[in-house]
């Protein structure tokens, strides 16, 4: 008789017995041998085909991308062949993010440059206030400001090195070295000097009808003054009285040695009053001569003209040879200038007509 239970193990526990054949058949799926194998093979084949299709699709996409890139490169090469070749790296495509970064960089660079120029202009404005050149009508250019500042620093350093008070003329010559004529006029106007007095080498560029600085003054052949000049407040019309001048106090003590020795007869400047600040006429600066206080008064005089017609031009000297005797300056019994303005205008017109005939 068979035992339904197996013998107990060493620990005395019963060992599980395998189920009978009919129970095993009910619990396990029916094993149709060749059909199950076919189904498994079909499933594996389907999985393999799907993987192969995916790989093929990926490879095809990669190939398409490569083809597109190759076509683009070929098009770019064709364009490059038509255009001259550029050196350096190829230009990348401008995407939206790169475009935004590019704009931001440009904005920052523009702001830096703007701040730099503002600082430079402010520094130049401060420098223009320091250098001895001031004008309400003209603003010095940047290069002229820097040149004048350099000359000013050099002149001050020479003063410190020598330890002596500088000569005004040499000081102004140092300041105006290498400057343009308008800037020189501005500097001279600030120091109340005439540019021709301290820059004789620049007078060669002046108009041909103007005498150079330092040249002897040639008096006119006629012993009377021209209509454009005020008549001198003397009882005689001798031309030697025209040159009894004193240096204007605007020149300072530096120019007094030029006037101490007295001016010889027939030499020296004509009537030049003190200089006002330079005037700007279309960018060119000129000096306006202000009449002195002595010339504010008017001096009426009478002139006797010959009754007959005027002779020809060569006889002008004979006609006016005795003009000094004919010109009389009565001091009493004459009305002031305001009393007969018409007479003065007629006299000036007559003198002008005589000169231009």
From Swiss-Prot:
Taxonomic superkingdom: Eukaryota
Compositionally biased region (Basic and acidic residues): 35-58
Subcellular location: Cytoplasm; Nucleus
Gene Ontology MF terms: DNA-binding transcription factor activity, RNA polymerase II-specific; E-box binding; protein dimerization activity
Keyword Lyase: no
Residue ranges with Basic residues bias: 84-96
Domain bHLH: 104-156
Compositionally biased spans, kind Acidic residues: 59-81
GO biological process: axon development; positive regulation of eye photoreceptor cell development; positive regulation of transcription by RNA polymerase II; sensory organ development
Biased composition (Low complexity): 9-25
Leader sequence segment: none
Region (Disordered): 1-96
Pfam families: HLH, Neuro_bHLH
Nuclear localization signal, short sequence motif: residues: 90-96
UniProt keywords, alphabetically: Activator, Cytoplasm, Developmental protein, Differentiation, DNA-binding, Neurogenesis, Nucleus, Transcription, Transcription regulation
PANTHER family noted in UniProt: BASIC HELIX-LOOP-HELIX PROTEIN NEUROGENIN-RELATED (PTHR19290), NEUROGENIC DIFFERENTIATION FACTOR 1 (PTHR19290:SF88)
The protein's assembly and partners: Efficient DNA binding requires dimerization with another bHLH protein.
Protein name in UniProt: Neurogenic differentiation factor 1
Species this chain originates from: Gallus gallus
Chain's gene name: NEUROD1
